């Protein structure tokens, strides 16, 4: 039986559980449940602190886990990314009071508050900077106002919380992050794990693509196919209308409108886009 770790709370939790549910797995009926047995799919899900997930996976107690790239890196657990999930995007930045001309070099000898001490220590060491790293488990932004730190290092999504506290990020980002599935390093994916990953990839593909159908003169088919190459080539079927064909292809959701405009410009007709619920590609 597969043992899979899922964030029990926080920004990654809700979306991770939605994807698993859409992929056909049992959900967490009670928000206080620590584990859910999905006997139909031969999987048990464990709801854990996001910061701890990579440690459990590296230790062999769990097969795979959903966590943040930054959290996995800060844990220093011996894991690797198996699949990026495309949500929970953020950057990890230094920040300090706005308008004071901070730079990374000015961190020398200063106090830096963070919930990611290992990431910060590694970055400072790589830059040859000596500073005091103060670990906090939350509300890092208020630490400067309370006199605990001179600067902070934290996850930045919109930057609104920083601005509310009169802070601004400075220097280049320490890392970029998003939700990922991690597995033990140097361990091959098993067939059972591959099924789960395939289901999740199918959901991600379905969310990021549309199915496009249209009719076009066969003489313009090469042009149309160049606009809609699909995943492994478009599906082309003859129409009763002489010298015309029906074409079907997957297109990225983000560029669907521009793609439809291009098709219309070369004479395509009856251009229709439909959602994809589940896919295996």
Curated annotation (Swiss-Prot):
Location relative to the cell: Cytoplasm
Pfam families: HisG, HisG_C
GO molecular function: ATP binding; ATP phosphoribosyltransferase activity; magnesium ion binding
Top EC class of this enzyme: transferase
Catalytic activity: 1-(5-phospho-beta-D-ribosyl)-ATP + diphosphate = 5-phospho-alpha-D-ribose 1-diphosphate + ATP
Functional pathway: Amino-acid biosynthesis; L-histidine biosynthesis; L-histidine from 5-phospho-alpha-D-ribose 1-diphosphate: step 1/9
Entry's EC annotation: 2.4.2.17
Signal peptide: none
Function: Catalyzes the condensation of ATP and 5-phosphoribose 1-diphosphate to form N'-(5'-phosphoribosyl)-ATP (PR-ATP). Has a crucial role in the pathway because the rate of histidine biosynthesis seems to be controlled primarily by regulation of HisG enzymatic activity.
Descriptive protein name: ATP phosphoribosyltransferase
Origin species: Corynebacterium efficiens (strain DSM 44549 / YS-314 / AJ 12310 / JCM 11189 / NBRC 100395)
Lineage of source species: Bacteria, Bacillati, Actinomycetota, Actinomycetes, Mycobacteriales
Gene: hisG
């Amino acid at each position: 039986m597969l043992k899979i770790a899922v964030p029990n709370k926080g920004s990654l939790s809700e979306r991770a559980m939605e994807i698993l549910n859409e992929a056909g797995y049992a959900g967490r009926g009670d928000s206080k449940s620590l584990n859910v047995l999905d006997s139909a799919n031969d999987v048990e899900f464990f709801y854990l602190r996001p910061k701890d997930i990579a440690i459990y996976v590296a230790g062999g107690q769990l097969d795979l886990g959903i966590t943040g790239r930054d959290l996995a890196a800060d844990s220093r657990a011996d894991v690797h990314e198996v699949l990026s999930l495309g949500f929970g995007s953020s950057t990890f930045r230094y920040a300090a009071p706005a308008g004071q001309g901070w730079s990374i070099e000015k961190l020398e000898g200063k106090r830096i508050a963070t919930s990611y001490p290992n990431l910060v220590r590694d970055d400072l060491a790589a830059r040859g900077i000596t500073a005091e790293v103060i670990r906090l488990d939350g509300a890092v932004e208020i630490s400067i106002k309370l006199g605990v730190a001179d600067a902070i290092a934290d996850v930045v999504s919109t930057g609104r919380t920083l601005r509310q506290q009169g802070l601004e990020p400075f220097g280049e980002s320490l890392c970029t992050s998003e939700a990922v599935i991690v597995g033990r390093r140097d361990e091959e994916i098993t067939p059972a794990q591959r099924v789960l990953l395939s289901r999740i990839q199918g959901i991600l593909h379905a969310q990021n693509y549309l199915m496009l159908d249209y009719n076009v003169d066969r003489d313009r088919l090469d042009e149309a196919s160049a606009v809609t190459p699909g995943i492994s080539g478009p599906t082309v079927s003859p129409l009763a209308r002489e010298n015309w064909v029906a074409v079907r292809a997957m297109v990225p959701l983000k560029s669907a409108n521009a793609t439809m405009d291009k098709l219309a410009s070369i004479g395509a007709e009856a251009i229709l886009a439909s959602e994809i619920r589940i896919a295996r590609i």
